[in-house]
Structure formats: structure tokens, C-alpha cells
Amino acid sequence: MPGQKEKLLDTYEKVLIAQGKTTMASKLMPGIRFVTSDTGVASAKVSAMLMGTQYPIHIGGCVAVDHCNQAKVENFEEAFSKLFAQFQDSVGKLKKLLEIPLAYPVNAMTRVCKSLSLPKKAAVEAIAMYEMAYGDGPSTAHDVFMAMQEIPYIMKAEHTSEDKLLRLEENMARALTLRWSDYDLPKAVSF
């Protein structure tokens, strides 16, 4: 979706640049994942992604397109319209994460991962990586959300099936809608 980059990411990129995250802003590109199955499930799934990071970032739910009885191109065009609207909404939520300060980002990340029931081993590893890289000083919900993107990368390195990775990514995208202040508490939490 290179031709749509400016339309979809313009405001988000400007905020990233204003916060000194120019490298990230220059790498991001909107993308689409198209998944179909031959196991009797008569639908295809289309989902919005942010490409350009180490691992694509899933930023919303999947839009299903029923393809039994010979679906037509119009069915997919309708799904792409829904996906485009969802993408804009999700990028807006991602931008809002930049405005949410976290006093205890490691605790917040741990609580969010636990709340979303993310795989414990990979989540603990991602939390440790974040803590080594940034410590436990003040941060933003955006920084923590981006650090959480290590979890699918770790799972992929462990040869997790694509189906499980897709479910994990969809679940992680729910973090865009959380009230992060509820998770930013001083008391340490174990996973």
C-alpha cells in the first residue's frame, strides 16, 4: 500500500518525528495481510498491518470475506473498504498511545501481557528485553506497545504455527483499546 502511505500515516508520522522517532517514522508502511484456508473454512481474512519494523505490527481485527459459492471481486472490494476505515481508526489509536505517559512501564507491560493472556515465556522475554534496553524510567504506552511486538517475533523464532501467530497478533492489537493508566501501578507484579 505504498501509494496510500501519506493518507493513512501522515499525522502519526508527524507526531513520531516531533518526538524524535524519525527512524521509525521513515520505515513504517501500511500493509495488508490476506489469509485463506483450504481446511473447510469458507472465508478469507484480510487484516491491516504496519510494515517496516522487525516484524509486521497487526493493528486491528480481521475482516472476513465469505468465499463459498464463488465470491466475486465486489465482496473483496467491500472488505477492503472496511479494512481501510479500520486502518485509519487503528492508526489514530496508535497515535494516542504516544500521549499516554507511563511512570512504571515494566509493570504496565507485565500487567497488559497478563491481561491479554499472551504466551508467558515469550512475554517474560520481551519484558526483560524492554527492561534491559530502557530500564524502568518513565515512558509512553506507545513505547511499551512497540516493545510488545517482540512477542510474535520470539514465537516465530520458536516455529509457532502461522495460525497461532495470527491469533496472537489479533489479541495483541486489543492493547490499542486498553485504558493503560489502569495498568501503570507502582506495585510490582509477577507474570
Region spans (language model):
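Intrinsically disordered, low-complexity regions enriched in serine/threonine
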Residues: 3-191
